[in-house]
């Protein structure tokens, strides 16, 4: 008998996470490493676990994640979004609870491009009147 996985894709900034969940003992593996090893900062680990803690499913699923692109913060957000979508795929009843917490909505904020003639996206060169 094949093990059935529930799948969710999460995105944040330029990071993309592919998340597979199956009933298990609560192991979270990101790119072949345990979550505590992959995310060096405590905030990253906390962000990843938020949907599970909120729905009371911490320790009930084995989660396998492939994440590419972006930095540590963007990847943590992408994994959270992916776990949220995978949980909804597992049980649609969780959707309203997750939406109320703001985990279902994709954070659309992206880095603004640098403009010609400016130092950064909006920072201009210092102007001297005299």
Curated annotation (Swiss-Prot):
PROSITE patterns: RIBOSOMAL_S9 (PS00360). One of its GO terms (biological process) is translation. Pfam families: Ribosomal_S9. NCBIfam families: PRK00132.1 (NF001099). GO terms for cellular component: cytosolic small ribosomal subunit. One of its GO terms (molecular function) is structural constituent of ribosome. The lineage of its organism: Bacteria, Pseudomonadati, Pseudomonadota, Betaproteobacteria, Rhodocyclales. Keywords: Ribonucleoprotein, Ribosomal protein. Gene3D superfamilies: 3.30.230.10. It comes from Azoarcus sp. (strain BH72). This is Small ribosomal subunit protein uS9. Belongs to the universal ribosomal protein uS9 family.
């Amino acid at each position: 008998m094949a093990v059935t996985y529930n799948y969710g894709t999460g995105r944040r900034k330029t990071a993309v996470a592919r998340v597979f969940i199956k009933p298990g003992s609560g192991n979270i593996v990101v790119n072949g490493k345990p979550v505590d090893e992959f995310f060096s900062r405590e905030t990253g680990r906390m962000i990843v676990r938020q949907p599970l803690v909120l729905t009371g499913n911490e320790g009930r699923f084995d989660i396998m994640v492939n994440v590419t692109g972006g930095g540590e913060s963007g990847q943590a957000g992408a994994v959270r979004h992916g776990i949220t979508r995978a949980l909804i795929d597992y049980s649609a009843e969780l959707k309203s609870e997750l939406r109320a917490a703001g985990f279902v909505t994709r954070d659309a904020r992206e880095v603004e491009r640098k403009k010609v003639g400016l130092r950064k996206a909006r920072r201009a060169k210092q102007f001297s009147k005299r």
